[in-house]
């Protein structure tokens, strides 16, 4: 899996590439734009994998996140053949790198949201959830 590596005043951590949708963009258009900005890749957007609510007041970073409620939609994506991990022209604040991480090594990564580890390792489960709820 390809992850953005970030650093803040507390720690280094990893997140999936992506971000906000601009007015007039479809979800795939927004994801392609965000991936160009963050990981310098023109991705092919595939199936919707997960939907997650994030209500900051319910989680450990409530004070730092300013009482937000976000809806996150996670898609499977394909990268162009020969892609080498690199930051795009407009990386996220705190982004210090882009890295491939084998799924069987996700436990060694400080991944956010943490709950994704389990779900990413069980993508083949025919009973897997799509809507994950308000989880972190």
Segments the model singles out, each with a brief description of its role:
Residues 16-50, 75:
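The catalytic Nudix box helix
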Residues 11, 52-59:
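Short, solvent-exposed loop/turn segments at secondary-structure junctions
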Residues 11-14, 84, 88-136:
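Nudix hydrolase/Nudix homology domain
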Residues 21, 79, 103-106:
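Hydrophobic pocket-lining residues within nucleotide cofactor-binding pockets
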Residues 56-86:
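Active-site-adjacent beta-strand/loop module that shapes the phosphate/pyrophosphate-binding cleft
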């Amino acid at each position: 899996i390809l992850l953005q590596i970030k650093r803040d005043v507390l720690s280094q951590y990893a997140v999936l590439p992506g971000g906000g949708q601009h007015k007039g963009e479809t979800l795939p258009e927004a994801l392609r734009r965000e991936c160009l900005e963050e990981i310098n890749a023109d991705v092919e957007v595939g199936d919707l994998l997960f939907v997650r609510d994030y209500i900051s007041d319910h989680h450990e970073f409530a004070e730092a996140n300013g009482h937000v409620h976000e809806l996150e939609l996670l898609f499977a994506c394909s990268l162009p053949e020969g892609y080498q991990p690199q930051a795009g022209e407009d990386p996220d604040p705190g982004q210090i790198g882009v890295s491939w991480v084998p799924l069987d090594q996700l436990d060694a990564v400080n991944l956010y949201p943490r709950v994704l580890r389990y779900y990413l390792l069980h993508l083949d489960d025919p009973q897997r959830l799509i809507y994950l709820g308000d989880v972190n």
